[in-house]
Amino acid sequence: MLFSRIIAASAQRKLSVYLKKGGLVAYPTESCYGLGCLPTLAKALGKLAHLKKRPQHKGMIVIGNQLEQLQPLLQMPSENIQTMLRNEWPAPKTFLLLAKSGVLPALRGKRRSKLAVRVPDHTGARRLCQALGMPLVSTSCNRAGKRACRTEREVRRQFGRDVWIVGGRIGRQKSPSQIIDGETGKRLR
């Protein structure tokens, strides 16, 4: 299904219902396909970690179409940090910011207080979040130890019918997004 079609009302409703039931979605991002789910559903986060064979102590990245869509998951950053984020995004830059206390440990990582968030530099990924009206988890679409999927065909080969696939082209970014501590400015990846 192409991004232009996902915005059609019927497809949008179907995908939204699917995600609210704990479904997983694969979609193009800056450097590869992303694999995601709703960031507020423990069942979906567990399913995603299991499918990827990913250790559950690792945190996950959440993407949104703009900062305001991510704010319900975050403690309100200072005005300076908000200004910096608005100037930096959209970009292949993920920032670690203080998470609200109700954010699931499976999302932020066990014993961690910060959440990794990004407004991607991929129009389709932003439009997907905008069309759904909610942020999405965004991990690389691959099983642990395997290369990240770069095409719809590769997603089908690795995951079959376990995920809803949003077709489209990935961006031109060659490497994963940078990860930066939003408070200290320290680059972690």
UniProtKB/Swiss-Prot annotation:
Domain of life: Bacteria
Reaction(s) this enzyme catalyzes, per UniProt: L-threonine + hydrogencarbonate + ATP = L-threonylcarbamoyladenylate + diphosphate + H2O
SUPFAM superfamilies reported in the protein's UniProt record: YrdC/RibB (SSF55821)
GO cellular component term of the entry, any: cytoplasm
Keyword Cytoplasm attached: yes
Keywords: ATP-binding, Cytoplasm, Nucleotide-binding, Nucleotidyltransferase, Transferase, tRNA processing
EC number: 2.7.7.87
Sequence ranges assigned to domain YrdC-like in this UniProt record: 9-189
Subcellular location: Cytoplasm
GO biological process, one term: tRNA threonylcarbamoyladenosine modification
GO molecular function annotation: ATP binding; double-stranded RNA binding; L-threonylcarbamoyladenylate synthase; tRNA binding
Pfam families: Sua5_yciO_yrdC
Keyword match Oxidoreductase: no
Function: Required for the formation of a threonylcarbamoyl group on adenosine at position 37 (t(6)A37) in tRNAs that read codons beginning with adenine. Catalyzes the conversion of L-threonine, HCO(3)(-)/CO(2) and ATP to give threonylcarbamoyl-AMP (TC-AMP) as the acyladenylate intermediate, with the release of diphosphate.
Recorded family membership: Belongs to the SUA5 family. TsaC subfamily.
HAMAP family (alphabetical): TsaC
Protein name: Threonylcarbamoyl-AMP synthase
Species of the source: Neisseria gonorrhoeae (strain ATCC 700825 / FA 1090)
Lineage of producing organism: Bacteria, Pseudomonadati, Pseudomonadota, Betaproteobacteria, Neisseriales
Gene label: tsaC
